[in-house]
Amino acid sequence: GRYGTIGEVFYAAEDFWPLNTTLFVENYHGNDAKFIYYFLKTLEWSKFTSASAVPGINRNTVHKEIVSLPDIETQKRIASTLSMLDEKIKTNTEINDNLADLLQTIYQERFGNDILAVNQGVLSDICSYSRDKVAVSELNVITYFSTENMLSGKAGSTEATSLPTTSQTTACHKGDTLISNIRPYFKKIVYCEDKCGCSTDVLCFTPSQPHYSAYLFSTLYADKFFAFMVAGSKGTKMPRGDKQQIMTYPVVLPSEEELAGFNTIASPLLEQIYSNRAENKRLSILRDTLLPKLMSGEINVSAVQL
């Protein structure tokens, strides 16, 4: 990124249309393209920015940067090693997308038609908003959620870039579901697999009973719910969901037998999704740790066993 997302580096394997806010490389001067992609991620791009009202990268300054690169064969081995980690992360992400779609399909087949359901109710019958508090000192960048580090399109979350300056924030527990309450059309949702905390811009839905956890998440994950939330939101520039209106969302009240049958399928799926995300975090840490060490030669790529 030249402006806006300054310093973010992307690798395009297919044809693309670059905007004038980007810098792109076409000629690699005999170097391995994938290696250069990883190498560029190690540069301190902030030192190349111009001191203007809208900071941007000065390409002339970048061109003058003196760098040292290994031979082409070493480049290929380094790129291959790092690519293996990225491919595994990509595969896990695709698996999780399929598992989430499968879970939603099963939910819709069993409980999607609330009009025909024998037992009908509203969202407040199966959950409430968390009123618990947790000390910020007990949280970290992995266990704190805000609208900034929750991803749109139901894609989960990333690590937080900072923690709140307040002493306490909303406490969330295993089995709760988090939804960003700002611009709900972005569909930011996270299933809590452990104790955590969230900002005031995030709604923490706590199931009325623990065995409602998977059912609650599946209910809130549905596009139909987000459409309902958007319809009741207030504000134009930065709309927020109406907490009272949200709790009137119509739901099916499953029998104990129906709920048990659903949990038999849903709980293992959610556990697998969590396991894959946890593995992705470990792989990302490993990749980001190896990246500068491989580039600098501190670690010989031949010594890396994956």
Regions found by a protein language model. Give the residues of each.
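Amphipathic heptad-repeat alpha-helical coiled-coil/stalk segments that mediate oligomerization
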Residues: 305-306
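A short beta-sheet element
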Residues: 1-41, 50-53, 58-59, 169-170, ...
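Sequence-specific dsDNA recognition surfaces
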Residues: 10-13, 17-24, 124-135, 139-174, ...
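Proline-centric
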Residues: 22-30, 46, 60-86, 203-213, ...
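A short secondary-structure junction motif
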Residues: 43, 47, 152-154, 223, ...
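Structured core elements
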Residues: 24, 66, 177-179, 204, ...
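Non-catalytic DNA-recognition/assembly elements of restriction-modification systems
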Residues: 64-136, 150, 256-302
